[in-house]
Amino acid sequence: MNKQKLGQFIFISCLLLVSCVGFAQNLTIQGSLKDSIANRALNSATVSLVYAKDSSLVSFSRTNEAGAFNFKNVAPGNYLISVSYVGYVPKWVPVITGTEKTVEMGLIYMNDVNTMSTVTVTARRPPVVINGDSVEFNSENFKTAPNAVVEDLLKKMPGMEVDKSGGITVNGKKVTKVFVNGKEFFTGDPVMATKNLPADAVDKIQVYDRKSDQAMFTGIDDGSEETAINLKLKKDRNKSTFGKLNGGAGTPSVFDLQGNVNVINNDEQLSAIGGANNTNRQNFSNRNIINFSGGGGGRPGAGGGVTVNFSGGSGETDANAQGIAETFSIGGNYSNIFNDKKTEFNANLSISDVERNNISSSFTQNLTPGNAFNRISNANSIAGNKQQNFGSTIDHKVNDNFSFRFTPSLGFQQTTNYSEDSTQTYLTNGNLLNSNTTVSSSASDAVNAASTLLLRKKFAKKGRTISSTITQSFNRSNSTGNQFTEQLSYINNKLSNDSILDQQNTRKGENSSYSANLIYTEPLGKKSLLEFNTYLSKSIGSSSRRIFDRNNATDNYDLLNTRLTNEFNSEYTYSGGGMSYRSNQKKYNFSTGFSLQKAVLDGENISAKTKLSQSFQDILPNATFRYNFSQTKNLNVDYRTSTNQPSITQLQPVLDQSNINRQSIGNPDLKRSYVHNLNIRFFSSKILAGKSFFSTLNASTTNNSIVNYDSVLPNRTILTRPVNVDGAYRINGSVNYGFGIKKLKSRLSFGLNAGLNNNISYANGLLNTIVTKSTGPSMSYAYIVDDVIDINLTARYSFSQTSNEVNPTLNTNFLTKVFGADMTNYLPLNIVLNQSFNYAINTGRAEGFNTAIPIWNASFSKFFLKNKRAEIKMSAFDLLNKNIGINRNVSQNQIVDRSYNVISQYFMLTFTYSLQKSGLGGGARPGGMIIRM
């Protein structure tokens, strides 16, 4: 049995094994709810079934119009039933099952709080409370492992899914914001909260649809909303200090150190983190601020194609990352609310130092008509990246009608790079055409300062508002570097020429930008309004690139290469205004409007002593429509238009040969691109049944799309130049359906995505159409038994077909299959065993790049000391030692298959100690956090 069949056999066997669990459950518990005074049935009340021994949730449902409920396929045992209804006192009823197949609970009467003289508040609360489209889960009914984080708790919630990167979906809808006690945690990154806060610190998880800031400001629903989660902390954690210290080391020479502390004093929160590792764990996202373009405009398109990145692995270590990184980072976040709750303040600081070692090899098939060739490349590089970033937000409410928000930021960056690259180019008959060896180095630094001021004013009349946003930014970048290239040229495999390129370069870029807008809304009745807006934006930049050739006489780089040297000043100005109409009805809301935009570019090429001036005027219409079939079923249609202006780099007719194999030159005749985009989304869910259906359709077309015009020079160097084309469009769609299987304590999800991209480009002077069709079905299965076992199975297929009109030899078909299995066993003696298996298979690539990659990771944890504060873990990454990195890129004239180094097999022993001190005392379990990104 080969590796591919073995992996598929293991995956299917696991699925069948799990599917056989739990079929012995055959009891039914049923009853009905009524008002104790009016004797009327209570429709849509929440009924939860929990285990009597520990209150962990078994299932939950809602009553029908007759007030009836039932739970099917329940195992014999002792239970409690919780019933809750808005305006009524919650109630708990014990259930003891025997040998009967149906347990009749009869009538359960509930008391209206308004008819009672006194209400006794008990410590036991309902596991689930539903109010409209919001759901509240009580954490005490969901069991997690010792020292679990919020992410582990969310995985236990009905209808919630958490992917390996930490992304959260609730019944198919992506969660975009996570709040802690109503405030965003650590600059609003939801992953920071769910991956780091301890699960036992959370009292309630509240899930709701959050309206847009503009809708909350005007009071008129604009149809824009996002799914949000609020984590309400336990009372004793509102005044507490908690954190975690983690140290791990292993073979071969791997280490992972992390530490953090959180201090919460009601509204005041302070978090500090630090870490160092060489396992490709990145604690902060990279924010590249280096910019030599002088500002303005967009970036060149590649002329169409598809890119597939492919490697095995899963878990905290980034197995897919190219290269091996050694990372050091520290950071902090402070937030507080003061001045009688009128002022919210947040500040954060992050410092990181990353050094990445990259080793790669590639095989390029360039199939340009009349100039086809193959190229083999090998490259080694060491790249360093240091960043220091500070950000802050001050949100002040002057009174009920006027507020402002000020957001300053400051960032610094320093980079170094050293690379060695060797390339051999062969004709299609196998003869060697040339061989290049390049050694290059560079050092760069940059500073970026920005600020935004938002002013908001409400008037007495509801819906009448005025707001303004003023922004400012400044960027300065500097770089110096050296490049040495030796090119050996051959004729009939015999050396014909040996040329040397030995240069030093300096680059400088500076950009200042300012913008302001003004928005006024005027209500039309109670459910509609008109919005008027105007804006002005200006960007002033300068760009300098000076190239010096080596002077053999002086052995210095003092010969200015005027052909490659360029200095340019530019000024971009955007201005315009528009209006829109919004209406919010009971079942639907819609908006329609337009804006007028004028863009003016003035540029001066100091080196060539030439000037450039361009001006564009556009009308940009937009429209949105939302229809609510019910609180959990809706249809959204969104139409937008936008423009992309050419960048200064794209407009300058100056040669850039920093890449000896692919050189570029700008085009001063470029026009702006005009984009039409249509997005349709349908969503339906049944929260209690755990069912969700979600589908999307996105279509876009671009006029004057900016693509690359590639020409092949006699030595097979590619010269690329941006040009405008029409006819580019793309259509993408997806369907997802998920449902819970209460009998198996499981959830099953299916997905399908498909796409059609029609790209226009030029293949060595010939207008070319590249059509890419793609489709990909997927499936996931989750099986969870509290304190016993968690199992997650996934399968994903991805098929892509590319056709090339001018050059059919570039037509490609390739298939990627990925199977995954994750299992966590909670064993006696406070032992936890975790395993993950990923099996990735790809076909349709160049020889040597069709691989099957099985990745098996495992860990063994033991918790000890009082309250399980300490953990010792033995973990193994890539037990089979099979991890590799592969990348395929299909563009307008070539196919590039590339392999690169990735993190390989290692074994690590880790010790973790949790810190926790509660200001109010109490018996809460100690918690902690370990920063995971």
Predicted regions and their residues:
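Membrane-proximal, glycine/serine-rich, low-complexity loop/turn segments characteristic
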Residues: 25, 66-68, 89, 96, ...
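Short, ordered, surface-exposed loop/turn motifs in non-cytosolic proteins
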Residues: 37-51, 130
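A short, solvent-exposed loop/turn motif at the edges and junctions
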Residues: 51-56, 78-94
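Short, acidic Ser/Thr/Gly-rich low-complexity loop/linker segments typical of extracellular
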Residues: 52-68
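Surface-exposed extracellular loop regions of Gram-negative outer-membrane beta-barrel proteins
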Residues: 223-245, 354-380, 384-397, 401-428, ...
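Outer membrane beta-barrel strand-and-loop segments of large Gram-negative receptors
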Residues: 378, 513-515, 559-566, 665, ...
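Conserved C-terminal beta-signal and adjacent last beta-strands/turns
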Residues: 778-796, 811-933
